[in-house]
Amino acid sequence: MEEAEASLNEAADRLSIPRSAWSGEDFNVLAISGGAAGGAYGAGVLVGLTRAGRRPNFAIVTGVSTGALIAPFAFLGHQWDDRLQDAYIGGHAAGALGLGGLSPGLEPGLFRTVALQRLIHPFVDEALVSAVAAEHRLGRRLLVATTDLDSEKPCVWDMGEIALRGGVKATQLFRDVLVASASLPGLFPPHRFTVEAEGVAYEEAHVDGGVTAPLFIMPEALLHWRKLGRRMQRGRVYVLVNTVLEAAPRTTALNLPAVLVRSFDTMLRVSYRQAL
């Protein structure tokens, strides 16, 4: 019990923002959901808030699936709005997810991982990762969730800690986590990460974070911690849901991509409503 309490204290310390950095401001948390192409809505909301002069400063930003792709730009602020807009309305998806991105034969996904990488890599460069590291040093936190298929559990990545490593390897891992969080099962193969435990190296298969966590505010253990309110005062939580929560009846085409997307979309609608 004492070890668990110490672990929660440490996690809260990592997520708590130093008073000097946020004195006089509310402790705002932004949770961005999945939603595939609906991410264009979330991007538009953020840009619209900027133009209206109503965009809050966020101490913590979390993202899942397409929300994970938006999260770094939401985290870094309005200066990155142009890149965020280009990522979602610049027509890049049509090129990356065309016939050239299809997987040959019996692959674990309809599209190859490289198709998703082509969408993400141009917008997530060393400059962006360095900017995330700078904000992390100020005490702000950027968190992204994937789903570990092997353990059947969500995995929360502290992207600022990754960014702090600096260099090419940090940028590559940063990109890999975003690719994994957006790897919709059936459409894209799982992304494999090499990890080490007790001196033994092995691989974990990670897919879309929305499989286990349609959205999240912070790691679940912290949400249920009785001392959380005292550690994080003056908090507001903003939730950006990148889909319509009401059912949208229509005829589903009887082909693999249409059935996969429709099934996953239905599952997510229900899980979003339950999460909210």
Please identify what each model-predicted range represents.
Residues M1-I60, F75-L276:
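Patatin-like phospholipase
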